[in-house]
Every structure is written in structure tokens, then in C-alpha cells.
């Protein structure tokens, strides 16, 4: 994207298309995607946000991602645990927007330290489309540090105490399901009252020790999700686009260029 932006003619507008931030939606943003998108970052905006009459609402049913390995068996989950989803090391979310966690082995090391120093059980799940394999990390797993690659992500979110993520879509899905989230990287949803954020291992451990007394606000979370569903996301997934969805995209493009 940055190369294309550098090569574009002067005064040439841009639109960025991406998978939708909510289930069964599409992203169309004139500024960028992920951390570079145009979603407001001000908690006060969401505290006072009111969706237009008849606007779409966020769905709380996630759409499962198909794993590369379809022979994975679910594991029995402990009664209390922290969920840490892996991301794809090659993705820009990690390469560009993760200042202090360079890859999933570093993320695993943080989870391991969290389990040792806090006594919490930590459950990991590898990214379903990642080409990386981690036999060395699986060899370190035990009853307080385990992988649940065969379990549905929604189950792992709903049954955990809280979610720790760099900046994954799983963090956004966790907000959708009403779970507390701690981010470690640059995420567009790093908004006070919406998530807690850690810029170091020490901050991660300190926040974990402070759970559940985190400064989170339901009002901010509800306003954030209402805004995404009502105004930011375009209803319908681009992979299954029909005429109506293409018309919604066209209307959004016209509105953003002032041509509507």
C-alpha cells in the first residue's frame, strides 16, 4: 500500500478495501486499514454516539476461519484461563504495528512468563492460516500453558477471563462478545475505556495482576460497536458480493468523495 501511495499522481484520491471489521462486512476507507484507518480514537465520541434510525447493528456470532490443518482435535479447557491468539508473523499487523513483540515466539515467551509470575493458566491458539509451525513451543506446553488449535475461537473467547492480543481481529471479536481485552501493539481500537494497553512485559504483568479492576467502560464499548456497524462497516462480505452489496460500496465511495 505504501509503495502505491508513493507512486500515485498528485491529488489522486485513494480507497482501501479490506475484510470487514465485523462479521459479514467490508471495509472501505480513504485513509488506510488496520491501525491506519479513519475510525475515531476518542472515547468521548463513543460515550455520546447515537446511531441513525434503522442503522445496522453488530452481530455477536463470529464466522469461523477455516484452518489449514483440518484434523485438529479440541482440548478440554480449564475453568479459568487467559486467551492469547497467535497472529501471522508475515502480516503487516505484526511487521509494521507491533513495536515490541516481534513474532509469535516472543508472544509465547510473554504468555509463559505471565503463567509463571501470575499463576494464571494461558491458552494459545495458532493463526488458522499461518504457514509457521511451532513444535518447539508445543514441547513446552503443560497444564498451565497449552495450545487449543482445535477449539472454536468463539468458545475460547467466551470462556476466558480476558484476552491478550498484539492487535488481532480476535481482539475486536472479543469486544463484540463482551470480553476484556489487553493489547500489546498498535491497534485502531486502543481507546481508553475500550481496552487496556501494555507497552512492555512489565506493564502486561502489572495489568494482569490488576484484573478485573480495569478501567473499562461498557458505554464506550457499546458506542464503538454501534458506530462500526451503523456507519463505518459496509454490510456484506466482499467475497460474496451481490448487486445490492456492490451498490452499497458505490454509494459509500460517492459519499466519501462528496459526489452523492
Placement of each model-derived feature along the sequence:
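A donor-sugar binding/catalytic signature common to diverse glycosyltransferases
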Residues: 1, 150-197
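Active-site and donor-binding regions of nucleotide-sugar-utilizing enzymes
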Residues: 1-39
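A short helix->loop->beta-strand "cap" motif at the edges of active sites that frequently abuts
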Residues: 10-14, 120, 179
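Generic beta-sheet signal
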Residues: 15-18, 125, 166, 184
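Short loop/turn segments at strand-loop or loop-helix junctions that form parts
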Residues: 19, 79-93, 126-127, 186
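Leloir-type glycosyltransferase catalytic cores
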Residues: 32-79, 194-260
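Mid-to-C-terminal functional-domain signal that highlights helix-capping/loop sites
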Residues: 92-107
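Catalytic donor nucleotide-activated moiety binding site of glycosyltransferases and closely related
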Residues: 108-147
Amino acid at each position: 500500500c505504501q509503495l502505491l501511495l508513493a507512486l500515485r499522481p498528485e491529488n489522486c484520491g485513494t480507497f482501501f478495501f479490506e475484510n470487514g471489521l465485523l462479521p459479514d462486512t467490508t471495509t472501505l476507507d480513504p485513509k488506510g486499514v488496520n491501525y491506519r484507518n479513519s475510525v475515531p480514537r476518542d472515547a468521548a465520541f463513543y460515550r455520546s454516539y447515537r446511531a441513525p434510525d434503522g442503522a445496522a447493528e453488530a452481530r455477536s456470532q463470529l464466522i469461523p476461519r477455516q484452518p489449514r490443518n483440518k484434523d485438529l482435535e479440541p482440548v478440554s479447557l480449564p475453568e479459568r484461563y487467559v486467551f492469547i491468539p497467535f497472529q501471522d508473523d508475515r502480516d503487516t499487523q505484526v511487521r509494521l504495528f507491533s513495536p515490541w513483540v516481534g513474532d509469535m515466539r516472543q508472544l509465547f515467551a510473554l504468555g509463559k512468563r505471565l503463567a509463571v509470575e501470575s499463576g494464571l493458566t494461558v491458552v494459545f491458539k495458532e493463526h488458522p492460516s499461518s504457514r509457521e509451525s511451532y513444535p518447539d513451543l508445543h514441547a513446552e506446553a503443560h497444564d498451565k500453558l497449552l495450545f487449543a488449535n482445535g477449539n472454536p475461537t468463539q468458545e475460547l473467547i467466551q470462556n476466558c477471563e480476558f484476552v491478550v492480543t498484539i492487535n488481532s481481529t480476535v481482539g475486536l471479536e472479543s469486544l463484540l462478545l463482551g470480553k476484556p481485552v489487553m493489547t500489546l501493539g498498535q491497534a485502531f481500537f486502543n481507546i481508553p475505556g475500550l481496552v487496556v494497553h501494555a507497552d512492555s512485559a512489565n506493564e502486561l504483568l502489572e495489568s494482569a495482576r490488576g484484573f478485573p479492576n480495569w478501567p473499562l467502560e461498557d458505554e464506550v464499548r457499546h458506542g464503538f460497536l454501534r458506530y462500526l456497524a451503523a456507519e463505518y462497516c459496509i454490510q456484506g462480505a466482499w467475497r460474496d458480493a451481490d448487486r445490492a452489496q456492490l451498490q452499497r460500496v458505490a454509494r459509500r465511495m460517492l459519499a466519501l468523495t462528496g459526489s452523492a
